Amino acid sequence: MEGWQRAFVLHSRPWSETSLMLDVFTEESGRVRLVAKGARSKRSNLKGVLQPFTPLLLRYSGRGEVKTLRSAEAVSLALPLSGITLYSGLYINELLSRVLEYETRFSELFFDYLNCIQALAGTTGSPEPALRRFELALLGHLGYGVNFTHCAGSGERVDDTMTYRYREEKGFFASVVIDNNTFTGRHLKALEEREFPDVDTLRAAKRFTRMALKPYLGGKPLKSRELFRQFMPKRTVKMKKD
């Protein structure tokens, strides 16, 4: 694509002595694989530009699976993620790299991604609400349509006090059994509205998105989750000392 378009780098790795292989998420073309020739050389004006969470304008060309980056400019400084928000950002980057096919347009998802990164950069509390909203948006764009407001069995609106079990591709059915795969009507309404007023609804949202994303991710664990697990004990120890 010869024209300029907005983009973010999801991941990069060395490619030859002076170049980079990039996995980028673009507004118009979706996920694209690019070679940035000379980007690692000392004199490259791309040094420090092709970083995750930096809003970019870029141009590329080529007809194969791997395109060639022609030029790139940072629209602004990288969004300031650190600590837990940095690991959260790495998680959604890896999520996109795992579930999106190359060169499939997801313009609305691009802005959901931007909104999530901005929310992470601006939060002073837990990143969990922003992550759950993004996961739900991603599932919607992947065609994973779920009716959170009505019981799939009776067709009636869900009741806050009742329990429902999710059946893949069918929806939520009333259930007398309560376990890790069931949700209350209150949980389902929170998922529909994407508002999580307390720890209980946040945990329920995390259970659902993990369940729903599993078929897309397969059996291979996410590296960012492992990094996050390693980070959390250190963070807990530091908080106790403080």
Swiss-Prot record:
InterPro entries associated with the record: ARFGAP/RecO, DNA_rep/recomb_RecO_N, NA-bd_OB-fold, RecO, RecO_C
Annotated Gene3D superfamilies: Nucleic acid-binding proteins, Recombination protein O, C-terminal domain
Family classification: Belongs to the RecO family.
A GO BP annotation: DNA recombination
UniProt name for this protein: DNA repair protein RecO
The protein's role, per its UniProt record: Involved in DNA repair and RecF pathway recombination.
Subunit structure: Monomer.
UniProt keyword Ribosomal protein present: no
Keywords in alphabetical order: DNA damage, DNA recombination, DNA repair
One Pfam assignment: RecO_N
One annotated Gene Ontology cellular component of this protein: bacterial nucleoid
The keyword DNA damage is annotated on this UniProt entry: yes
Gene from which the chain derives: recO
